A protein has these predicted regions:
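Hydrophobic alpha-helical transmembrane segments of membrane transport and translocation systems
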Residues: 87-179
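Hydrophobic alpha-helical bundle architecture
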Residues: 26-30, 51-62, 67, 71, ...
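Membrane-embedded alpha-helices of multi-pass transport/permease systems
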Residues: 75-78, 82-85, 155
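Residue-level signature of catalytic and energy-coupling elements of molecular machines
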Residues: 3, 22, 51, 79, ...
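Alpha-helical transmembrane segments of multi-pass inner-membrane proteins
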Residues: 9, 13, 17, 35, ...
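Structural signature of multi-pass, alpha-helical inner-membrane proteins
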Residues: 1-15, 167-179
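Hydrophobic transmembrane alpha-helices
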Residues: 26, 41-45, 64-78, 122-125, ...
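Interfacial segments of transmembrane alpha-helices in multi-pass membrane proteins
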Residues: 5-60, 126-130
Length: 179
């Protein structure tokens, strides 16, 4: 039992260190939009843990692996959005138009990747047993919270920061390289 608890503690620490590393990298690379992504990622993690707590789920190593995967998919969605906004800025669009187009145009890609992963998670749940089924439950919930946090939460935060500014001339999204 103590060996299993030790592995779970290490898994929790690994997930937290991974979160911290992602946070630092995102803020350095995307500045304000990186901070928004990190805040949305934190909300994603809190939502996922809250849902698991409401379900009275026991935290296991497969569950921790699914949480780590959910965090990876959530940050990937934010990277897609941020890069799409940068691309729109490079194309000469205004900051407001770039934000709008960035979220809209990244959505299909994010939805496709999450739906295909969700299908795999549902298959694992239907046909798996024991730890595989536990992984699948956390994985499916993580996909749903990731979609919510990456698309809706981050956009709401960006709208809070930039939405009221009508004469916005610049975005704090890191270096925008023109080819």
């Amino acid at each position: 039992p103590s060996m299993g608890q030790d592995n779970i503690n290490r898994g929790i620490h690994s997930t937290l260190w991974g979160f911290a590393a992602i946070a630092v990298m995102m803020i350095i690379y995307y500045v304000t939009f990186g901070a928004v992504s990190v805040l949305a990622l934190g909300i994603n993690l809190l939502l996922l843990v809250a849902i698991l707590s409401m379900l009275q789920a026991t935290l296991t190593l497969p569950g921790l692996a699914a949480i780590a995967l959910a965090l990876g998919m959530a940050i990937d969605a934010n990277v897609l959005i941020n890069e799409r906004i940068r691309e729109e800025l490079r194309n000469g669009n205004t900051p407001q138009a770039s934000i709008h187009a960035g979220y809209d145009r990244a959505f299909d890609t994010i939805l496709d990747s999450n739906v295909t992963t969700l299908i795999a998670g549902l298959a694992l749940f239907m046909f798996g047993t024991g730890p595989i089924k536990g992984f699948a439950v956390v994985h499916v919930l993580g996909i749903l919270t990731s979609m919510f946090s990456a698309v809706l939460v981050s956009r709401a935060i960006v709208n809070l920061i930039y939405g009221y500014r009508r004469k916005l001339t610049k975005l704090s999204i890191g270096q925008i390289y023109k080819a």
